[in-house]
UniProtKB/Swiss-Prot annotation:
Disulfide bonds join C26-C116, C28-C44, C43-C95, C49-C122, C50-C88, C57-C81, C75-C86. Binds 1 Ca(2+) ion. PANTHER family: PHOSPHOLIPASE A2 FAMILY MEMBER, PHOSPHOLIPASE A2, MEMBRANE ASSOCIATED. It catalyses: a 1,2-diacyl-sn-glycero-3-phosphocholine + H2O = a 1-acyl-sn-glycero-3-phosphocholine + a fatty acid + H(+). Ca(2+) binds at Y27, G29, G31, D48. It comes from Trimeresurus stejnegeri (Chinese green tree viper). The active site is at H47, D89. Snake venom phospholipase A2 (PLA2) that shows a moderate inhibition of ADP-induced human platelet aggregation when tested on platelet rich plasma. Exhibits moderate hydrolytic activities and prefers the anionic micelles (dPPC with deoxycholate) to the zwitterionic micelles (dPPC with Triton X-100). PLA2 catalyzes the calcium-dependent hydrolysis of the 2-acyl groups in 3-sn-phosphoglycerides. It is an enzyme of class 3 (hydrolase). This is Acidic phospholipase A2 CTs-A3. It comes from the Eukaryota.
Amino acid sequence: SLIQFETLIMKVAKKSGMFSYSAYGCYCGWGGQGQPQDPTDRCCFVHDCCYGKVTGCDPKMDIYTYSEENGDIVCGGDDPCRKAVCECDKAAAICFRDNKDTYDWKKYWRFPTKNCQESVPC
């Protein structure tokens, strides 16, 4: 679920997903099109593609199971769809953490959609 995604971002990247990634670049936030603008925006592009491959559940609403083991997030549960959503969220949170040094709020926050025209395939 989006609430769990926010929680994973806080745990892994130590930032608020809502305040840092909900309207960033061409892909962070609702929807997405165009070229990813920087490594953080690419994290969101890959996350969108990951959600697009998930079938059988609603990635934004369904609750998944995970645990923390030795500082790592471990996705669990019996539902393969929900587990896949967890893996998508975990990968994005790690990507955000690993690209914090190139995050550019001033340049890409509320980035104009007119600059996000030429889409790329997943």
